[in-house]
A protein has these predicted regions:
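A short, ordered amphipathic alpha-helix with a cationic face
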Residues: 20-24, 132-134
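Short, Gly/Pro- and small/polar-rich lid/capping loops
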Residues: 1-18
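Structured binding/interaction patches within domain cores
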Residues: 39-232
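Generic preference for hydrophobic/aromatic residues in regular secondary structure cores
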Residues: 13-16, 30, 192
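Active-site nucleophilic cysteine motif
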Residues: 23-36
């Protein structure tokens, strides 16, 4: 979805934060931002959004570094309207990504980490234990992937989607290699992008969405409150 300039500028004024945030302060999570655009009450469970996407996106939002989290803002208009009956397709997409992309990548990262030579014995033990925790979690996630394969059990698929999001977030946070963390966050954002693409192009109401955000900041100005800025 192409963002028009007015909506893009309105989104720039929003600060994405952990938790549901405070709409009146211009600080929201990606899902409460979706609710704001849709004209819904302040919530991180907007009725207009795919529950599967929500389950995957929230652990990403809450675990990303602040600057990386801001990359999720353009997804809010794309998530709006994804409550479209296409979550079975999204579940299969996520299942394939888990088995073909995520778990192989984590396995490779684990082996590389174990092969490194660290300077201290305690550091070696800590790193090895951390990677083994990820290995066990990855093996458990492969079992959870069965839930994603069965689109008739969407409650389990939604729970598994949340687990995939948490696994990616944990791997990105625990790696000691900043470049590997960036690659994992890129993988997570790419998966969100692909899930939003399911269902094709949805009708855009960018002017109405921009207006709702502008009203948030106009209200702040009227009360003499500073507008939210994104921290460097």
């Amino acid at each position: 979805m192409h963002l028009d300039l007015r909506l893009e500028r309105a989104l720039e004024r929003v600060e994405l934060v952990t938790g549901v945030g405070t709409r009146d302060a211009g600080r929201m999570c990606v899902m409460s931002l979706v609710a704001c655009l849709a004209g819904e009450e302040h919530t991180d469970s907007p009725a207009c959004a795919s529950p599967l996407i929500r389950a995957f996106a929230i652990p990403l939002n809450d675990n990303m570094p602040h600057t990386v989290r801001q990359r999720l803002k353009p997804f809010a208009p794309r998530i709006l309207g994804t409550q479209d009956g296409q979550d079975t397709v999204r579940a299969e997409l996520l299942r394939q990504a888990l088995s073909q992309e995520i778990l192989p990548k984590l396995g490779g990262g684990r082996q590389a980490a174990q092969a490194r030579r660290f300077s201290g014995a305690l550091w070696r033990v800590w790193s090895l234990l951390g990677m083994r925790r990820l290995e066990r979690e990855a093996e458990w996630m492969m079992d959870r992937a069965v839930a994603l394969a069965d689109g008739t059990d969407m409650a389990r698929a939604i729970a598994a989607a949340g687990s995939v999001g948490r696994l990616l977030a944990r791997a990105a946070r625990e790696t000691t290699d900043p470049r590997e963390a960036d690659r994992l966050w890129d993988l997570a954002v790419g998966l969100l992008d692909r899930m939003c693409d399911v269902g094709g192009v949805r009708p855009s109401a960018s002017q109405a969405w921009a207006l709702r955000l502008e009203q948030v900041f106009e209200s702040r100005t009227a009360r003499g409150m500073p507008t939210a800025t994104v921290r460097p």
